[in-house]
């Protein structure tokens, strides 16, 4: 959530940030500013009525003790209480209205994020490892998976519907091995391994920015205030929801393997075959909570941690700086890692490492204490890595002419 003080003090900065996202809201912002100003006036008036109520109540008590006439004071108290209740209700309603409107405004675009109109304006930062030159036409992962009996796509449809898969046999062993390898690498880089629930309440999804704006993308449990998590970013970040952390305990670095669930609303017709886009998938996530001065360095550290895994698996990849219009709702700056898929003859996203600055921390009330003062922390998140897409990349990059798959040395000890 953006700072309402900033909206009032530097309206143009907020408006410009939204325009950079192709999400202009000038009229809505102006109306919101008017509501905030009106709210502040009413709040001052409410505080005045409360002070008056306290003052008269004391006078009433003194006169009662003196057995003096209190009828006038009693009437004053009753009339003031009516005004107090009415104004208190109005202030509460305005507060809710402001919070709701603020909650659907995306994060401010970081100064380091380049201006762009769409994903075509994203900027390649660097490439790591050179794609292999094949002496045969490389197959796509779904062909290789079916040939080797590793993935049963029809079984997933039978059990659920499209965009679900069943992984079995040696494919399941590779899948499990990838998870173990990712967690080991992340732990080596200082991230604590944590297992969390796959269900969370509405407050947690508000904290990380999925609600209320993206309700249609999340699976909800009927008749319960519970949702299936779209990413472990939600659970790991919100472990510190409404928490004040001692500055000596920063940074907090966490990693988790979880199933993730997404409705993929708006993805009709995209990646309909294979494991690229699923309703349920596994992901190993990185989350960090840092001092504001340290979040940029942490973002680089998280990127290198994810890249280290891809290098160990001998998978060519590249870093891509997202432009302003391609940023996620909560992100201020995002760098994607894209892995080379020879079967598709292109790079595809396998990790997205985002610095949200204090945006999530303000929503989730994640603070740290320094010099006896509470301040908002910075939060970061990123995949390290998406397990299914890593398996896709492994199959396509390490396929042999006969359709068999070479196993990288780093993975052998996990099998």
From Swiss-Prot:
GO molecular function, one term: ATP binding
Protein name: Serine--tRNA ligase
Biological processes annotated in GO: selenocysteine biosynthetic process; seryl-tRNA aminoacylation
Binding-site list for ATP: 262-264, 349-352
Catalytic activity: tRNA(Ser) + L-serine + ATP = L-seryl-tRNA(Ser) + AMP + diphosphate + H(+); tRNA(Sec) + L-serine + ATP = L-seryl-tRNA(Sec) + AMP + diphosphate + H(+)
Gene giving rise to this polypeptide: serS
SUBUNIT field: Homodimer. The tRNA molecule binds across the dimer.
Entry keyword annotation includes Ligase: yes
Pathway stated in the Swiss-Prot or TrEMBL entry: Aminoacyl-tRNA biosynthesis; selenocysteinyl-tRNA(Sec) biosynthesis; L-seryl-tRNA(Sec) from L-serine and tRNA(Sec): step 1/1
Coiled coil ranges: none
EC class (word): ligase
Homology family: Belongs to the class-II aminoacyl-tRNA synthetase family. Type-1 seryl-tRNA synthetase subfamily.
Binding site for L-serine: 231-233, 285, 383
Domain of life: Bacteria
A Gene Ontology cellular-component term: cytoplasm
PANTHER family: SERINE--TRNA LIGASE, SERYL-TRNA SYNTHETASE
Comment block on domains: Consists of two distinct domains, a catalytic core and a N-terminal extension that is involved in tRNA binding.
Main location: cytoplasm
Lineage: Bacteria, Pseudomonadati, Campylobacterota, Epsilonproteobacteria, Campylobacterales
InterPro entries: aa-tRNA-synt_IIb, aa-tRNA-synth_II, aa-tRNA-synth_II/BPL/LPL, Ser-tRNA-ligase_type_1, Ser-tRNA-synth_1_N, SerRS_1_N_sf, SerRS_core, tRNA-bd_arm
């Amino acid at each position: 959530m953006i700072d309402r003080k900033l909206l009032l003090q530097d309206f143009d900065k907020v408006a410009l940030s939204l325009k950079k996202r192709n999400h202009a809201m000038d009229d809505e912002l102006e109306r919101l500013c008017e509501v905030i100003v009106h709210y502040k006036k009413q709040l001052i008036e409410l505080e005045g009525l409360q002070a008056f109520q306290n003052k008269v109540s004391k006078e009433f008590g003194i006169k009662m003790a003196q057995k003096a006439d209190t009828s006038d004071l009693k009437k004053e108290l009753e009339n003031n209480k009516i005004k107090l209740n009415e104004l208190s209700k109005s202030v509460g309603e305005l507060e809710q209205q402001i919070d709701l409107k603020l909650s659907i405004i995306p994060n401010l675009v970081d100064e380091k994020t380049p201006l762009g109109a769409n994903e075509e304006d994203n900027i390649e930062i660097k490439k790591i490892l050179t794609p292999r030159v094949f002496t045969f036409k490389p197959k796509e992962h779904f062909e290789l998976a079916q040939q080797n009996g590793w993935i049963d796509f029809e079984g997933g449809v039978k059990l659920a519907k499209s965009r679900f898969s069943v992984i079995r046999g040696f494919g399941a062993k590779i899948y499990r091995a990838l998870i173990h390898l990712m967690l080991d690498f992340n732990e080596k880089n200082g991230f604590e391994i944590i297992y969390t629930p796959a269900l969370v309440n509405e407050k947690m999804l508000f904290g990380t920015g999925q609600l209320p704006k993206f309700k249609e993308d999340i699976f909800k449990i009927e008749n319960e205030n519970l949702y299936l998590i779209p990413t472990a970013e939600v659970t790991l970040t919100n472990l510190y929801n409404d928490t004040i952390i001692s500055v000596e305990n920063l940074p907090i670095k966490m990693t988790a393997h979880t199933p993730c669930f997404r409705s993929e609303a708006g993805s009709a017709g995209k990646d309909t075959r294979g494991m690229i886009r699923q309703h349920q998938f596994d992901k190993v996530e990185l989350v960090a909570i840092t001092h504001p001065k340290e979040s940029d360095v942490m973002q680089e550290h998280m990127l290198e941690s994810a890249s280290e895994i891809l290098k160990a698996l001998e998978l060519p990849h590249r870093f891509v700086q997202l432009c302003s219009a391609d940023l996620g709702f909560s992100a201020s700056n995002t760098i994607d890692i894209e892995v080379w898929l020879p079967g598709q003859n292109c790079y595809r996203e396998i990790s997205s490492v985002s610095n949200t600055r204090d945006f999530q921390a303000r929503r989730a009330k994640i603070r740290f204490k320094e010099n006896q003062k509470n301040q908002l922390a910075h939060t970061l998140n990123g995949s390290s890595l998406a397990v299914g897409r890593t398996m896709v990349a492994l199959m396509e990059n390490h396929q042999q002419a006969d359709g068999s798959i070479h196993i990288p040395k780093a993975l052998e000890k996990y099998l």
